[in-house]
Curated annotation (Swiss-Prot):
GO BP annotations, alphabetical order: mitochondrial translation
SMART domains: Ribosomal_L2, Ribosomal_L2_C
Locations listed in the record: Plastid, Chloroplast
Protein name: Large ribosomal subunit protein uL2cz/uL2cy
UniProt feature, compositional bias: Basic and acidic residues: 262-273
Gene designation: rpl2-A
Pfam families tied to this protein: Ribosomal_L2 (PF00181), Ribosomal_L2_C (PF03947)
Region feature (Disordered): 1-23, 224-273
Quaternary data: Part of the 50S ribosomal subunit.
Alphabetic keyword roster: Chloroplast, Plastid, Ribonucleoprotein, Ribosomal protein
One GO location term (cellular component): mitochondrial large ribosomal subunit
Gene Ontology terms, MF aspect: rRNA binding; structural constituent of ribosome; transferase activity
InterPro entries associated with the record: NA-bd_OB-fold, Rib_uL2_dom2, Ribosomal_uL2, Ribosomal_uL2_bac/org-type, Ribosomal_uL2_C, Ribosomal_uL2_CS, Ribosomal_uL2_dom3, Ribosomal_uL2_RNA-bd_dom
Length: 273
């Protein structure tokens, strides 16, 4: 969808650039409520994920990441906004009467037909195993574990590429630049996730950020020493260290956070950029 620029009637909308409005009329049997009470805290009430809290109430849409409706074609009926992700979703009416939500593939329009299975065309929105796809295919919603459902390349504009197949494994280049092995029997959806311009949006004001459940971000250098290692000093003082750190004293700006000796290290051929 296109990026919409506001008319500069107020200072808050002068710098705003948001996506054009997509209506949301979810089906009652495909939604359920969520109770957001954590606000970035753990069970002891300590902040473990900063800058979270508040936000508008949301209803969770049940998304079909498994795409296990085999050899039954479905038709795209609506393209809707989902408050729980930056990608749009599609309501699919299948031939047997069932209705499901899927991620909106880029370029898909209302009335298009999709299908899942092993011997289906290599066309946008169709889901099939990696072993049945030709090399160079652009894919998204990729399974890591067979039958568990898609877990990779699900954000707006995300796309991965099938670059090799050898033995029981397929080699993929993920959106992060990581190159890794995945079982050829795992399924994926052909095409790119829609709403490619999601990263070009500018909310323009703090209130819009608040509606998304994101709290203000404060620099550590303006805090007190009890709150951050960078804090304290008289007036505008430097951080007082050779290198910046996190609020808990660990090195910041580039420290690797991935667990050492993780079981999946043997499947990663090249680390992400």
């Amino acid at each position: 969808m296109a990026i919409h620029l506001y008319k500069t009637s107020t200072s808050s909308t002068r710098n705003g650039a948001v996506d054009s409005q997509v209506k949301s009329n979810p089906r009652n049997n495909l939604i359920y409520g969520q109770h957001h009470c954590g606000k970035g805290r753990n069970a002891r009430g300590i902040i473990t994920a900063g800058h979270r809290g508040g936000g508008h109430k949301r209803l969770y849409r049940k998304i079909d990441f498994r795409r296990n409706k085999k050899d039954i074609s479905g038709r795209i009926v609506t393209i809707e906004y989902d408050p729980n992700r930056n990608a749009y979703i599609c309501l699919i009416h299948y031939g047997d009467g069932e209705k499901r939500y899927i991620l909106h593939p880029r370029g898909a329009i209302i009335g298009d037909t999709i299908v899942s299975g092993t011997e289906v065309p290599i066309s946008m929105g169709n889901a099939l195993p990696l072993t049945d796809m030709p090399l160079g295919t652009a894919i998204h919603n990729i399974e890591i574990t067979l039958g568990k459902g898609g877990q990779l390349a699900r954000a707006a504009g995300a796309v991965a590429k099938l670059i090799a197949k050898e033995g029981k494994s397929a080699t993929l280049r993920l959106p992060s630049g990581e190159v890794r092995l995945i079982s050829k029997n795992c399924s994926a959806t052909v095409g790119q996730v829609g709403n490619v311009g999601a990263n070009q949006q500018s909310l323009g004001r703090a209130g819009s950020k608040c509606w998304l459940g994101k709290r203000p971000v404060v620099r550590g250098v303006v805090m007190n020493p009890v709150d951050h290692p960078h804090g304290g000093g008289e007036g505008r003082a430097p951080i007082g260290r050779k290198k910046p750190t996190t609020p808990w004293g660990y090195p910041a700006l580039g420290r690797r956070s991935r667990k050492r000796n993780k079981y999946s290290d043997r499947f990663i051929l090249r680390r992400r950029k």
